[in-house]
UniProtKB/Swiss-Prot annotation:
Disulfide bonds: none annotated. GO terms for molecular function: DNA binding. This is SRY-related protein CH4. The keyword Nucleus applies. It comes from Gallus gallus. Pfam families: HMG_box.
Length: 54
């Protein structure tokens, strides 16, 4: 979406992607959720002492 609309602000891209996400069924979301869990576990293993600090 960002490549198709290079002048669009990140906040607008996030809103549109969020709206598209809400339209997906649980089955369509499942691969992304599973991948997110896998990546989170991998990150926790590689960086056990990591603390988010904004």
């Amino acid at each position: 979406m960002a490549q198709e609309n290079p002048k669009m602000h990140n906040s607008e891209i996030s809103k549109r992607l969020g709206a598209e996400w809400k339209l997906l069924s649980e089955a369509e979301k499942r691969p992304f959720i599973d991948d997110s869990k896998r990546l989170r576990a991998m990150h926790m293993k590689e960086y056990p002492d990591y603390k988010y600090r904004p």
